[in-house]
């Protein structure tokens, strides 16, 4: 019950202002979404085997079949020789390489077999010859420069050693010869004059 003259305070409902809305939304915006972890690319294995065409050529020359060698025979030879170096899917890559080489004229396709063409034989020989030449030149050059440098050092050292002791010996000999010659002359001149003076006085 309320007293007379007292009025009940009606409950005031506050409407949310724009400032309060911003405050409510602010903490939500502060939270940064977690960036997805970037997947590190798997490091590709270093290729240790020689180029496919070179391996194909080696297989065809080793098999030496007149009608050409089949892809299976080439793959078997490559697997026996480069087993640890070849990838798991090397047979698929070999099939593509055989087709591409035949299209370029490096290989001759006879039914289901492949044979080396003259162009394919020449290409590999020129590549190997050009690769070997720069290595030989690079090895020879530093040896010649080292030999000239050592020869120049050897020639310089004896010249300096011979030049220094010569003037000392010559100077010492000249001084020794000149001093006794001057000392002997006055003694020989004075001795006969003194004897003559004594004789005249007597």
Curated annotation (Swiss-Prot):
Q: Where is the composition biased (Basic and acidic residues)?
A: 18-38
Role according to the record: Histones H1 are necessary for the condensation of nucleosome chains into higher-order structures.
Question: What is its induction behaviour?
Answer: By abscisic acid (ABA) and drought stress.
Domain of life where this protein originates: Eukaryota
Q: What is its main location?
A: nucleus
Question: Where, subcellularly, is it found?
Answer: Nucleus; Chromosome
Signal peptide (from-to): none
Tell me the protein's name. Answer: Histone H1
Query: What species is given as this protein's source?
Result: Solanum pennellii
Keywords assigned by UniProt, alphabetized: Chromosome, DNA-binding, Nucleus, Stress response
